[in-house]
Amino acid sequence: MRHVQSASLLTALLSATKVAAHGHVSNIVINGVYYEGFDINSFPYMGENAPTVAAWTTPNTGNGPLAPDDYSSPDIICHQNATAGKGYVEVNAGDRISLQWTPWPESHHGPVVDYLARCEPNCASVDKTSLEFFKIDGVGIVDGSSVPGVWGDDQLIKNNNTWLVEIPKSIAPGYYVLRHELIALHSAGTEGGAQNYPSCFNLKVNGDGTDKPAGVVGTELYTPTGDGIIFNIYQTVSSYPVPGPTLYTGAATGVTQATSAITSTGTALTVGAAATTPASGSGASSSAAPSSSAAATPSRSSSAVPSSSAAPSSSAAASR
């Protein structure tokens, strides 16, 4: 009995260690408008009373990762047992979206990858296994001259745990799922060691583009032994193959990471509700930082907003 209790305790401790220091996207900012994400600390316990948000929901309250064993599971699409957000937010093609993470551990080096998948007729009722994702951003190794190097997520940390991604100007208007992901490689030197942290948001893209890029279903984005999944970061790195399909030809590369000034707080829309077109703009300022008087402060203490002390990081070209 003592042996069983000790084994159970060890398992519990290992599980706690696994999920203790990871993260999730707490909010997004589009053209200065702050939109709350899925709050893992409260929403799962609120049932139908949880606010309507564009973020996909997940019972993963421990902030834990997905493993390569999950790549063929629907969990890899938008995280563990994720269901579509009930709302959506509007964005103009060519605008930039700032995604705010909870503090990301500095040891978890790896790429930042973003995808879009078109939803028809909308994203709130979409079958996630039918979504076909095309890559619009992928930043891997930025500077490999020292070990373990400077990676995409190191730029995210430097930029107050935020990431800017640009919605391609050339895509056709309509409803899309934005799939944003960090892949931690600190244990990826052997098979099964990579850690994936996907988050999804429902968008309605406005514009006059016509492209409808072909995509890949989420369960076929990666393989456990694919390029960039098994990778030893504890060596001098001259190049790195960002996992996933080839970058969409219309994607904006080399987006300079910068904080987004918050000017107001927005609420996700639902299909059929009156909508307004977001103001034109890049959605980010390389020098402006949020001030305490610039916007209504979100009431949830768990929803982090970009810090005024975050400095813009250097530009990094998207890797293929």
Curated annotation (Swiss-Prot):
Record's description of how this protein is used: Lignocellulose is the most abundant polymeric composite on Earth and is a recalcitrant but promising renewable substrate for industrial biotechnology applications. Together with cellobiose dehydrogenases (CDHs) an enzymatic system capable of oxidative cellulose cleavage is formed, which increases the efficiency of cellulases and put LPMOs at focus of biofuel research.
Annotated catalysed reactions: [(1->4)-beta-D-glucosyl]n+m + reduced acceptor + O2 = 4-dehydro-beta-D-glucosyl-[(1->4)-beta-D-glucosyl]n-1 + [(1->4)-beta-D-glucosyl]m + acceptor + H2O
Keyword annotations from UniProtKB, A to Z: Carbohydrate metabolism, Cellulose degradation, Copper, Disulfide bond, Glycoprotein, Metal-binding, Monooxygenase, Oxidoreductase, Polysaccharide degradation, Secreted, Signal
Entry keyword annotation includes Secreted: yes
Carbohydrate-modified residues: 81, 160
EC number: 1.14.99.56
GO terms under cellular component: extracellular region
Region called Disordered, residue ranges: 275-320
Binding-site residues, Cu(2+): 22, 108, 197
Taxonomy, superkingdom: Eukaryota
Any matching Pfam family: AA9
Cystine residue pairs: 78-200, 119-123
Endpoints of the signal sequence: 1-21
Gene3D superfamilies (alphabetical): 2.70.50.70
GO MF annotations in UniProt: metal ion binding; monooxygenase activity
Cited function: Lytic polysaccharide monooxygenase (LPMO) that depolymerizes crystalline and amorphous polysaccharides via the oxidation of scissile alpha- or beta-(1-4)-glycosidic bonds, yielding C1 or C4 oxidation products. Catalysis by LPMOs requires the reduction of the active-site copper from Cu(II) to Cu(I) by a reducing agent and H(2)O(2) or O(2) as a cosubstrate.
Name recorded for this polypeptide: AA9 family lytic polysaccharide monooxygenase F
Organism: Aspergillus tamarii
